[in-house]
Every structure is written in C-alpha cells, then in structure tokens.
A protein has these predicted regions:
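Accessible peptide chain termini
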Residues: 1-2, 176
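C-terminal segment of classical bacterial N-terminal signal peptides
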Residues: 2-10
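Outer-membrane beta-barrel porins/channels
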Residues: 10-35, 39-41, 61-64, 69, ...
Length: 211
C-alpha cells in the first residue's frame, strides 16, 4: 500500500485583473481529485501535462487521453490529447480543451428577458518535453486560446514552462511551473485582458507501508 503526499505553493494574479480563467480549471477527474492543479505527481496520465508540461516525459508513447466532466450547473468540460516520443529523451504532444457554459438569459436595460445567449472557451496547445538528465525533465507548451460570448469573440496566446526533478529511489518529485505567460491578441472591446499568470512550486512523496 502506498500513500501520496503533496505540497504546493502558488503565486497568481487576482482573478478580477485577468481573463481566460478557465485555464486554471482541471481538465480530468484525476487532476480534480489531486486538488485541481497538481504539478509534481509522476504518473502515466497525459492529462497531467496540462498542469506542468515537464510531466509529459513520464507518459507512455502514443497515448490518447479523452476527458469529459460536468462543471457547475449547465457547464461542460472536455479535453483530448495525444503524444509521441522521439528517441529516449524527447516527447511531443498536442491537446485541445473546451468548456461550454450553457445557455444564459439575455436581458435589456430594464432587466426584461429578450432571449438567450451562450458562452464557451477553447484552448489548442502543442507540447514538448525533454529529459535533461536521468532525473530532471523540462517542458514547454504553446497555447492558442479563444473565447466566445454571444456574438463577441476574443483571442489570446500563452506559454507554459515547467521543470520536474524525480528521484525514483526515494519516490520524491519536485516541480516548478510558470503558467500562462502571454497576452490577448483580440479583445471583446477596447479593454485587453491579461492571462491568469501562475508561478507554482510543488512536491510529491509516495510513502509505502503506511496505514
């Protein structure tokens, strides 16, 4: 029997100062069960690369990952990912994630309903990870992000950077991730939003023979 302990620290911008906060949501049930944004767990699960691109190095070649979840009332989250290894050290992957917020009431200035509208967010990304040493891996992802609210659309691009150190003998994993570096290319209006930048440090330790 093994028990997994996780420690994480994060520095993030205030949500009111940013857009595209759906990028912080977990894309799989496994990620949600680990706290929503775990950057240091070593597992053969492609969905973990959404949190830290360096974790792609631990995923089996030619893995296909599909996820679908309900999130809050009327919202749906879906993601898909596929990876390919190159030699013994390099791995590349592509992914797409999608959140549909469902139908919402459209009202006029007098709060009289005039119809309905929908909103959704989409992110398409490419990933590359590389084993720098037998225990240290680095990763980068580049994301194209678009958001729709009724007839309005915005577009942004972002980059994630990650490092992971894994000691298989002691089963210690240490990670650093810089997430959502980038900005908006097209805004809904004249006000441009920043991406929800996160700087995260995490550690995981697997304990055996514990009750």
């Amino acid at each position: 029997m093994a028990t997994l302990a996780n420690i994480a620290a994060t520095r993030a911008q205030n949500d009111s100062q940013t857009g595209y906060n759906f990028l912080r949501l977990p894309v799989s049930a496994h990620a949600a069960a680990l706290g929503g944004d775990n950057i240091s767990v070593i597992d053969d699960d492609e969905a973990l690369m959404f949190s830290n691109p360096a974790l792609l190095s631990s995923v089996t070649d030619k893995s296909l990952n599909l996820n679908y979840m309900s999130y809050m009332q009327g919202s749906k989250v879906a993601s898909a990912a596929f990876n390919k290894t190159f030699g013994e050290r390099a791995t590349a992957a592509v992914s797409a994630s999608y959140i549909d917020y469902g139908k919402m009431k459209e009202t006029d200035e007098s709060n009289v309903q005039t119809g309905e509208f929908s909103a959704k967010d989409i992110s398409i990304a490419g990933y590359f990870s590389y084993l720098l040493t037998d225990r240290l891996s680095g990763g980068v992802s580049a994301k194209f992000i678009t958001s729709y609210i009724a007839d309005y659309n915005s577009i942004a691009v972002g980059v994630d950077l990650g490092l992971n150190y894994y000691d298989p003998d002691r089963e210690w994993s240490l990670s650093l991730a810089l997430k959502n570096l980038g900005g908006e290319l097209k805004a809904y209006d004249e006000d441009y939003n920043r991406l929800p930048f996160d700087m995260q440090i995490g550690a995981s330790k697997r304990f055996t023979n514990m009750p």
